[in-house]
């Protein structure tokens, strides 16, 4: 795969449609192209198909963890930055996410300035 660029869309991964839609709408208002995935397996499939400038992934989803998305990006040797987002965060989870390769760890609700 090619290197990611700002011309590539942002991938939003969240099992909750309301949150996914809100993040998509907010990012689109910022002038970004956005694609969404409903979980870990959907995200992996999309990552196989194209490059993304950024991946924003929920930490806890029914089919797995946002850390699995980070690990999959690492396995593909992509340089795509990943931010892990969660409503149930703690310091240990943040450290684990950052050690796995995420560039940021955000707690819901996230603000426009955080995006």
Each language-model region and where it sits:
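Charged docking surfaces used in two-component/phosphorelay signaling
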Residues: 21-29
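The feature encodes the CheY-like receiver
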Residues: 20, 62, 90
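Acidic catalytic/metal-coordinating carboxylates
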Residues: 39, 65-68
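Short amphipathic alpha-helix used as the core "switch/output" element in two-component signaling
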Residues: 45, 67-79, 96
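Short hydrophobic/Thr-rich beta-strand motif most characteristic of the beta2 strand and flanking loop
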Residues: 31-40, 46
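Active-site beta3 strand of CheY-like receiver
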Residues: 51-56
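Active-site residues of response regulator receiver
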Residues: 14, 58, 86
């Amino acid at each position: 795969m090619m290197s990611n660029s700002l011309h590539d869309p942002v991938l939003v991964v969240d099992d909750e449609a309301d949150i996914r839609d809100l993040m998509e709408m907010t990012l689109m208002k910022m002038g970004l192209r956005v694609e969404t995935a409903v979980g870990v397996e959907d995200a992996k499939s999309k990552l196989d198909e194209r490059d993304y400038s950024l991946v924003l992934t929920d930490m806890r989803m029914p089919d797995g963890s946002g850390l699995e998305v980070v690990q999959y990006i690492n396995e593909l040797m992509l340089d795509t930055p990943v931010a892990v987002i969660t409503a149930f965060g703690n310091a240990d989870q943040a450290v684990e996410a950052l050690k796995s390769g995420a560039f940021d760890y955000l707690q819901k609700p996230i603000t426009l300035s955080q995006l």
